[in-house]
C-alpha cells in the first residue's frame, strides 16, 4: 500500500470527483456531488478519495453518525466506486486502506449497501467477496423487483387485457418537465391517505434535481380527458431505469391507470435499448417481511427478484 493514500472529500474536489464518477464502471448519477448534496444539511459528509501516487483510483460516498460510517444514508445505494482499469486484487488493498483510515478516526462500525448487480453490465461481485473476507456481516436483504428489457417481458395476460381496455378509453402518456401536477394532485395526497407519509423528496427538491439532471430524472403522467390520473417518476441510467415514485388517483384506480402507465413505459424504454426496469423494493415491516400486493403487481408486470444486500463490519 506504499503508493496509496487516502483523504476526505473537500469542496475543491468537486470537478475531480464528478469526472471520476462519470467514468467509473460501478457508479450512477446518484454519486454526482450535485445529487449527493441537494440535502447535505441532513448528513455529515464523510466521503473519501483514494489515490495511487497522484492518480485518483477510487472514491467512497459516505456519511458519518458518531462512531459509525454509512455508504450512504442519503442515497438508494452506496459503495466503493473505482476506476474501470483497477485490477480486482487492488480492491482489497483499497478496502484495507479505507478501514485503517476509519480506525484512525475512531470509527467502530461501517455500514454499506452496494449498488445492485443488475445496474452494472460488468458486475460488482468482487466487493462482496472482499467484504465477507474482512468479516462483514450480511445483515439485511431487500427484494428489488426488476423487469429485464433485453428479452420478452412476461407481463400477465390479465394485465395485458386490462391495458388494451384502458387504451380504448383514450388515456394519454405524457412526459412533462413540471412535476407539480403529479406531486400535488396525486402523489402527496395519496401517500397521506394510504400511509400517513410524505415522499422522500419534496416538490421543490425533485424539481431542483430534475433541473440538475434533466436527462436522468423524468416525469411521465397519464391523463384522461386532460386530468392527471397517474404518474411515475423515472430515474434513468445508462443501462436502465428505476421508477422512483408511482401513484394513481382514485379515478385512476378505477381504470387501472398506473398499470397502464407501467406497461407503456416498459415498451418505451425497451424500444430505447435499455436493459432493465427497476420497479423498486417490496419489503415492509409486516410479519411476512414483504408487501404481498406489491409483489403480485410487479410480478404480473414481468418483474423477477434481484437482491439488494446490506453489510456491516465491526472495525474495533
Residue ranges with predicted function:
Residues 73-77, 140, 306:
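Short, solvent-exposed loop/turn segments at the edges of secondary structure
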Residues 40, 69-72, 287-290:
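Short glycine-biased active-site loop of nucleotidyltransferases that positions the nucleotide triphosphate
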Residues 43-45, 104-107, 217, 271-274:
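Short, high-confidence coil segments that cap the C-terminus of an alpha-helix
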Residues 1-11, 306, 314-316:
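Short, Lys/Arg-enriched, disordered terminal segments
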Residues 75-121:
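A gly/proline- and charged-residue-enriched helix-loop-helix capping module
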Residues 4-53, 60-68, 116-142, 146-252:
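A conserved beta-strand-loop-helix scaffold within acyl/acetyltransferase catalytic domains
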Residues 112, 141, 176, 279, ...:
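Residue-level detector of family-conserved "landmark" positions at structurally sensitive sites
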Residues 60-62, 81-83, 92-99, 216-316:
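Aromatic (often tryptophan-rich) hydrophobic motifs at membrane interfaces
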